[in-house]
């Protein structure tokens, strides 16, 4: 008899019959099991049937996926994928509209299954669907429901990657683009059309060019002004895709009307006021809360917008380029006025002009006084720093002149070098905003203030250069303190950004509250446990308390594992998310896990989790790139965000249970809890943070009675013995 691990107990349903309770031997061929099931109901031709899940997306069971069947799973006996595909193909071309509609509903549902999709595509199903859409103006006006299911089925089939998107015809593209550009279209059709266009753009450069001929930016903007946030989300996702695929030469010109632009010029349009204001007013400042997927798309849009700066950031200045040198001359002219130009002074010679230029460039704060162009040869920030300086000088001229003249009038040792500061600040902002990096799949931390201005980066630079100048004065800094000042400014900016101000003015106010003295106060408060508790008695007390605190943290981690967590299965973003749950037995001896229909809101019982792993069988915990599921999936492996949340349990005999935590907090909880189960140290960032917090709190509580009392570094000396003990009184 096979070992119990090869036997799975399931229930199998068939319409109009009592369910069969069956023990499936996973070593038997699937065809043999299906024949046994058919014999139980006296069904002929078992080759016409297969098994599929009764719950969730109702996926087919194949030889490749049969090991995913868990104890207690409910299965259905169903028509085989090839037979189902053939039947649906016939029904989709029926003369009866009711039959065709029912067929399309079923097709849209089954197309999410890769086994069925393969069979249907092999029967030229994609071609049939595209022809239905291409001839679909009549369908649109009278049978929008059928068209919506047709587009859903098409998108699901194409998402499997079985066939190339390049096989799509121009007629089909025109039809889909027509649904997007028409003013009154059914919401379901519009949603699927936007999703199809997004996939086309992302998967084929040639299709991008064809779509560009059919849609204008203005047509996409109209979908951002609707009240349906799902439509807005799909519209921004398409905008992001177009932006990402825009040719480099289309990303530079910022002087065109965005509404009339074809989508080949999508990257230009993002710098235009109309598009930005529509997103700001109808999406970010709308009356509805921003959902997770919308927040992600806004984050992607923000990243791609800032990435337009990458070319300038990585461009070195050419000291021999007169046009570039003229920008530096312009900075000098604006700061010191044209009257001081040595070329206007009668009889001024070349040497005299050079001397005056050198003096002015020194006052402007450049490192290379003779040839300041050399200051811009380092990348990053390259020419982007010069762009920022010129923007400040022209748009905020009073601020620029005040900063330059204020510093040039100080003593040499206390002047804040504007040129050097601007270059380093630009580099710092690029690092903080991660200019040039691709968006992460799991992030959604967009900043509303960056959508409030067409030149958000330049405006941010203007605010931060004033902050730098203010902080320099507060620190009474000299040239030797330059790096210290930059560290403080970085801290001020990174402390202000997480508050997500709604406008640049709010950001400026937040920075104003984070003065140098406030930063010192915050640093002192954060270092309190390190700076205030370093005397030997306090260190000894901390060492005595620490094991108790670690035990407390360990119990909390194990309790959280006993409560359990739900983990998302990686899949297509558009498809309904699937979850599975894992929790530790109350006796800490077994891990229970199993699939879920959806994300649970309450407690998941042990009885509903069919699988289990004895803790004694766990050999190791691996994380990140060492996880088997990170090695297998190249797309996931490249996603840094997912990689940082991945971990796997290795257990006997050579099996793995793979996790991707929903967030960093859950990741730390599970890594700590599993490490504690195996008797290893808990080394996560969360444990270090909790240990510091709890230790600090416990120390403060125990030292309350010693407030304002100086604790000596060494114990007091033992006094000498008294000369006599006559003072002792004996009762009696």
Curated annotation (Swiss-Prot):
Residues 565-686 form the PH domain. The keyword Membrane applies. Residues 323-497 form the ELMO domain. This is Engulfment and cell motility protein 2. Keywords: Apoptosis, Cytoplasm, Membrane, Phagocytosis, Phosphoprotein, SH3-binding. GO terms for biological process: apoptotic process; cell chemotaxis; phagocytosis. One of its GO terms (molecular function) is SH3 domain binding.
């Amino acid at each position: 008899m096979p070992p119990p691990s090869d036997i799975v107990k399931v229930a199998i349903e068939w319409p109009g019959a009592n369910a069969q309770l069956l023990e499936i031997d996973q070593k038997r061929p699937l065809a043999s099991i299906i024949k046994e099931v058919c014999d139980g109901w006296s069904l002929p031709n078992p080759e016409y049937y297969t098994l599929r899940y009764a719950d969730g997306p109702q996926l087919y069971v194949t030889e490749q996926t049969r090991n995913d069947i868990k104890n207690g799973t409910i299965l259905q006996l169903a028509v085989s994928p090839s037979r189902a595909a053939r039947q649906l193909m016939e029904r989709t071309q029926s003369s009866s509209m009711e039959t065709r509609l029912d067929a399309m509903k079923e097709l849209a549902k089954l197309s999410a299954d890769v086994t069925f999709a393969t069979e249907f595509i092999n029967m030229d199903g994609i071609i049939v669907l595209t022809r239905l859409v291409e001839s679909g103006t009549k369908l649109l006006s009278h049978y929008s429901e059928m068209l919506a299911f047709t587009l859903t089925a098409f998108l699901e089939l194409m998402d499997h990657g079985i066939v190339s998107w390049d096989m799509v015809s121009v007629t089909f593209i025109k039809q889909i683009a027509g649904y997007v550009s028409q003013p009154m279209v059914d919401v379901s059709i519009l949603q699927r059309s936007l999703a199809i266009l997004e996939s086309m753009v992302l998967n084929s450069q040639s299709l991008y060019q064809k779509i560009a001929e059919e849609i204008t930016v203005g047509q996409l903007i109209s979908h951002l002004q609707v009240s349906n946030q799902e439509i807005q989300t799909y519209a921004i996702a398409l905008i992001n895709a177009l932006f990402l695929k825009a040719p480099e030469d289309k990303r530079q010109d910022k002087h065109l009307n965005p509404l009339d632009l074809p989508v080949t010029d999508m990257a230009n349009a993002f710098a235009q006021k109309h598009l930005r204001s529509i997103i700001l007013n109808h999406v970010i400042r709308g009356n509805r809360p921003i959902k997770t997927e919308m927040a992600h798309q806004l984050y992607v849009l923000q990243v791609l917008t800032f990435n337009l700066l990458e070319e300038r950031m990585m461009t070195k200045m050419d000291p021999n380029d007169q046009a570039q040198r003229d920008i530096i001359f312009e900075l000098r002219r604006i700061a010191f006025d044209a009257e001081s130009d040595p070329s206007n002074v009668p009889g001024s010679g070349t040497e005299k002009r050079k001397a005056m230029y050198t003096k002015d460039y020194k006052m402007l704060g450049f490192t290379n006084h003779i040839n300041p162009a050399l200051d811009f040869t380092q990348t990053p920030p390259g020419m982007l720093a010069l762009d920022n300086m010129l923007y400040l000088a022209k748009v905020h001229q009073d601020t620029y002149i005040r900063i330059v003249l204020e510093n040039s009038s100080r003593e040499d040792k206390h002047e804040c070098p504007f040129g050097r500061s601007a270059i380093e600040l630009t580099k710092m902002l690029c690092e903080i905003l991660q200019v040039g990096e691709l968006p992460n799949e799991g992030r959604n931390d967009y900043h509303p203030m960056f959508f409030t201005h067409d030149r958000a980066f330049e405006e941010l630079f203007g605010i931060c250069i004033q902050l730098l100048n203010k902080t320099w004065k507060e620190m009474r800094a000299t040239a030797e303190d330059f790096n210290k000042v930059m560290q403080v400014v970085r801290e001020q900016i990174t402390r202000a950004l997480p508050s997500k101000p709604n406008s640049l003015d709010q950001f400026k106010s937040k920075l104003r509250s984070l003065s140098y003295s406030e930063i010192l106060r915050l640093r002192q408060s954060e270092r309190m446990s390190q700076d205030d508790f370093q005397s030997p008695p306090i260190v000894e007390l901390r060492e005595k308390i620490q094991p108790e605190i670690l035990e407390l943290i360990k119990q909390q981690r194990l309790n959280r594992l006993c409560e359990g967590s739900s983990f998302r299965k990686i899949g297509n973003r558009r498809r309904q998310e699937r979850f599975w749950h894992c929790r530790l037995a109350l006796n800490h001896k077994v891990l229970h896990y199993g699939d879920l229909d959806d994300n649970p809101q309450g407690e998941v019982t042990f009885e509903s989790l069919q699988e289990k792993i004895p803790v004694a069988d766990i050999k190791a915990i691996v994380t990140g790139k060492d996880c088997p599921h990170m090695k297998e999936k190249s797309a996931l492996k490249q996603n840094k965000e997912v990689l940082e949340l991945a971990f796997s349990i290795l257990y006997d005999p050579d099996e793995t249970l793979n996790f991707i935590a929903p967030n960093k907090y859950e990741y730390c909880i599970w890594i700590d809890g599993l490490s504690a189960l195996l008797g290893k140290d808990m080394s996560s960032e969360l444990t270090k943070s909790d240990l510091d917090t709890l230790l600090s709190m416990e120390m403060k509580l125990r030292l309350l009675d010693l407030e304002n009392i100086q604790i000596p570094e060494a114990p007091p000396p033992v006094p000498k013995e008294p000369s006599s003990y006559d003072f002792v009184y004996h009762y009696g």
